[in-house]
């Protein structure tokens, strides 16, 4: 089956572990989920045939859960518990670790200077963003008023783009979240945590942008 003409966001929903594959190739399937596989691969100068072959192998496996058929209320509850609550735990700990690493290893050329600042910016943006979703947008959708939520959804999508841009800054600051050979235990643990955060946040944004919001706007 040809996957190159399909949007990344659709492929993530229909193929098990496609999200991990796209993350490996640094392809944006959440904020950039509407771009086709071919376009995304060309932008990164990647071999679309090779990626398509890997997707074909993944597509042979059963998908864990097809969110395209799950009730919107259940999706919202899942987003809050799996992602919102998790981000609220992840970011304060990562900020503490980044502050320590930047202070202790200030004399090293490889230190991720500014990382604590960027993580703090992401924390502040996400804290405000998630509160707005939980207090305004999600209740509207649960009450069947999603088709009237074009304004709030547009704002949320714009804020998703802002978060995606901050993730790119964080990846640039951390050498694509790769610790140097002489990194201490805290440094390595922090980068593991940042990779987990990036995975979680991309899945979170993808589920909202590519499933929840379109279905809500369609009147479900």
Swiss-Prot record:
HAMAP family: RIC_YtfE. It comes from the Bacteria. It holds the Pfam family Hemerythrin. The keyword Cytoplasm applies. InterPro entries: FeS-repair_YftE (IPR023742), Hemerythrin-like (IPR012312), RIC_family (IPR019903). It comes from Enterobacter sp. (strain 638). Belongs to the RIC family. YtfE subfamily. GO terms for biological process: protein repair; response to nitrosative stress; response to oxidative stress. Homodimer. This is Iron-sulfur cluster repair protein YtfE. It is found in: Cytoplasm. GO terms for cellular component: cytoplasm. GO terms for molecular function: metal ion binding. Keywords: Cytoplasm, Iron, Metal-binding, Stress response. The gene is ytfE. Di-iron-containing protein involved in the repair of iron-sulfur clusters damaged by oxidative and nitrosative stress conditions.
